[in-house]
Amino acid sequence: MPPTIVLIRHAQAFHNVAHKFSHPPLTEKGEGQCSLLRENLLETFSNAVENPEDVAIIVSPMRRTLQTAMLSLDWLVERGVKIEGNADWQENSAKPSDTGSPISSVSPDFPKVNMSNVDALWPDKTSPAAERYAYSKKSILARGRRALEDLHKRPEKLIFVVSHSGFLRLGVVGYWFFNGDYRVFDFEAERGDEGELRVKQQDKTLSGGLGLSLTDPVALGHDLPEEDPEVDPSAKE
C-alpha cells in the first residue's frame, strides 16, 4: 500500500524578508515557527509512529529546509527514523536564494541527515547536464512527477517531506503553503490521463495542518516559464 505523505514548507528564512540572500538560513521568527510546527506534528503523528522503519523523512538539501526538519522532526530522528536529503525537492528558480551550496559545506552542520544519495549534480541548476533541475515548466513538472513516483515506490507507510512553497505548489500538488505549515496527502488508486500519479489531500489539512494556508487550489505549472529567463540560451548549445 502506498504511503501517506506529509508535505511541509520550511519556516521563514531571511530571503522571505529581504530577497537578496544566497542559500539563506531561518530567521528567529522561523525558528519560532518550527517550535509550533513541532508541537503540532508531535501531537498529530506521535501515536502513528510505532515502528521507525515504517516512517521516513525526506528533505531538500537547502539550509532552511534542513533546519526546519531538524527543529520540527527531531523527535522522529531520536526514535530512529531515517532522514535523507533529496535534490528533487529543492526550490524552482536558479536565483541565489533558491540555489544550494555544495553538500560538503552543508552536511557537517546536519550530521544526522544522510546525504549520500543526493544527486551529484547538486547544486547545479543551469548547465545542460542539470536540465532536470532547470527553472522551466517542463523540468519542474517532470521533477514533481518523479518525486511522487519515488515516494510511491518506497516501503514506508508514512513519509514526511520538507520542501519549498514554489515547488510544492506548482510542481507537486497545486496548493499554497504558508511558512512552517503542512498538508497531508494519500495516493489515489487511479493514475491521470498521462499516466501520472495523483494524490488527494486529507480534509483535515485543507487550510494547512496549522490552519495558516490558503484553501484555493492552483494549476500545476501555472505561470512557470518555458525557459529559465536568467540563463543565456547560448550556454545550452
Region annotations inferred by a language model:
Residues 149, 165-170:
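Extended, basic/helix-rich recognition subdomains
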Residues 1-5, 93-112, 169-237:
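Acidic, low-complexity terminal tails and accessory targeting/binding regions
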Residues 15, 20-25, 72-145, 214-233:
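Phosphate-handling substructures
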Residues 2-84, 181:
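Active-site-proximal alpha-helix that buttresses catalytic centers in soluble enzyme cores
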Residues 42, 138-153:
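Helix-loop module immediately N-terminal to the HCX5R catalytic loop
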Residues 5, 55, 157-163:
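Generic beta-sheet signal
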Residues 11, 164-165:
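Active-site metal-binding loops of divalent metal-dependent hydrolases
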Residues 59-60, 142, 162-163:
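Short beta-strand scaffold positions
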